[in-house]
A protein has these predicted regions:
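Hydrophobic/aromatic residues within transmembrane alpha-helices
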Residues: 46, 105-107, 165, 184
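Conserved CoA-thioester-binding segment of acyl-CoA-metabolizing enzymes
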Residues: 1-49, 81
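Short, active-site-adjacent cap segments at secondary-structure transitions
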Residues: 51-54, 98-100, 120, 209
Length: 217
């Protein structure tokens, strides 16, 4: 984990050298970054490693089944709620694949910037037999994805190229890989220049219904 504050914005880079799978440890690192950013910075930029933003929940922990799997999914649900409810600008730089819970990370952010390349974005839960989606998943998909792509993304488990992910609603912008991080910083600074209290109030007002349904605390 690399967390730092530059020019009054927080930056959280996560890279486990593999698939950036969301297990208990990485989720705790996300909570730390969110808490620190909320108290010390005007916005937060998150960035996965080149090639893989996140491949989703850690299947080793999920495949333990029973209470272990349930605990991980519940912890993930709390993370996505925390991100979707984060009162300051939350920007993601995605330089690789974002699948399943990795795609939900993107859907939880305010502004998502991806890079071109042979990368896939999507929700593969139907394809791997994990249905129905947890409430956090259906709410994020309904809130952020284009209605025209909703069935293809959620029900049909279609994987999207960066260009199609932009149209579907997984991304807001595509940038050259070499420029991605600097563009992400610039966007976070731009959004952080907006009145902070108004930004948080506006975000929560338009997401209130989804946040209420997503809340499991």
């Amino acid at each position: 984990m690399n967390f730092r504050i530059e020019q009054e914005i927080a930056i959280f880079e996560f890279d486990d050298g593999k698939a950036n799978a969301l297990g208990h440890e990485l989720i705790e690192q996300f909570f730390f970054a969110l808490d620190e950013a909320e108290s010390q910075a005007k916005g937060l930029l998150i960035a996965g490693r080149k090639g893989v933003f996140s491949a989703g929940f850690d299947l080793k922990e999920i495949n333990e089944g029973g209470s272990a799997a349930a605990k991980l999914i519940k912890k993930g649900a709390k993370l996505f709620h925390r991100m979707f409810d984060f009162p300051k600008p939350l920007v993601a730089c995605c330089a690789g694949h974002a699948v399943a819970a990795g795609a939900f990370l993107l859907l939880s952010c305010d502004y998502r910037i991806g890079s071109g390349g042979p990368f896939k974005y999507g929700l593969n839960e139907t394809a791997i037999g994990m249905a129905p989606l947890p409430v956090f998943g259906s709410e994020l998909a309904l809130s952020r994805l284009s209605p025209r792509f909703l069935s293809r993304a959620v029900i049909q488990s279609e994987m999207f190229s960066p260009d199609d992910a932009l149209e579907a609603g997984f991304l807001d912008q595509i940038a050259e890989a070499n420029d991605l991080f600097e563009i992400g910083k610039s966007k976070t600074l731009e959004l952080s220049s907006l009145p902070s209290v108004a930004y948080g109030k506006m975000k929560r007002s338009i997401r209130a219904s989804s946040l209420e349904r997503m809340n499991i605390s």
